[in-house]
Amino acid sequence: MKRIVCWTFILTSAGFAQQMAVQRPKITGIDHVDFYTSNEQANNHLYAEVLGLPSALPLETGQLQRFVIGKQWVGYSAAPDAKATNRMDHVAFSTEDCDALRVYLAAHGVKVRESAGRSKEGRSFRVNDPEGNVIEFVQPSGAIRAKPSGQGEALRARPDPVSRRLIHTGFIVRDRAAEDHFYKDILGFRLYWHGGMKDGQTDWAAMQVPDGTDWLEYMLNIDANPDLQTTGVMNHISLGVRDMKEAVAKMEAHGWKPHDKDDHSEIGKDGKWQFDVFDPDFTRVELMEFTPTQKPCCSDFQGPHPSEK
């Protein structure tokens, strides 16, 4: 019996030592987010015209559209199932070392491929988080980033894009503890802010990347079977702006007009000015000021705020 206990201790200690020996490389921010669309033309109107974002050549298999936000981008592929209620394909984070991160995740029990793949934008690999969301890690290639023509960078651009920074993305989360084990315990994400529609309730938890200011927002307490519109509101991206009045004025100059009285900016529960527009499949594109203008309602910020750089 003592031998069994001894060997169990040795094996457990060896596994723990292996985890400790493999260091996590830096995860610095959001590289891109990819969605599905049923209307390319309407999509192009929103991103290229209203938001003034540069269009770019597709990078991924099956991709139809790509819009550049500074050094980040949002992409769209054709919706494979028009009746599906989720238009988010995957979220990609930037890392300084794709191979090292893959080894690190494997050492912590995450199922990964045997090696990272190569693409036009650098090295990358994908995993599924505990709830099945597709998460990609990208080690961008500086050489490819520096070639605008023919390598996927901006093909055309307005001189006055509404935003040059993608500051967060969010999606529906059912089991916060399971997601925290993956994002917080293993990957090192940290809580930036949390709040809810009612005092004492957490409906949103902003999990900041460990080595930057971008964050992933858990959208909590959502109905078990949300429709396309609800899912579109929850599975979203957020573009950072310095001044919301200036951002809305730019959109109006680009031809945007409010549809109803609810089309206006407002201060969110986190104390930041926010404004929402939607793609043709109801996916929300949130504009958000980088810093709060008033104290948040539910909790203090626990991490640094993003900026345009």
Question: What are the residue ranges of the model-derived segments?
Answer:
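Vicinal oxygen chelate
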Residues: 18-26, 28-39, 65-68, 80-165, 170-171, 193-196, ...
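Structured core of small recognition/catalytic domains
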Residues: 177-266
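Short, charged/polar, Gly/Pro-enriched secondary-structure boundary elements
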Residues: 72-76, 83-85, 132-135, 212-216, ...
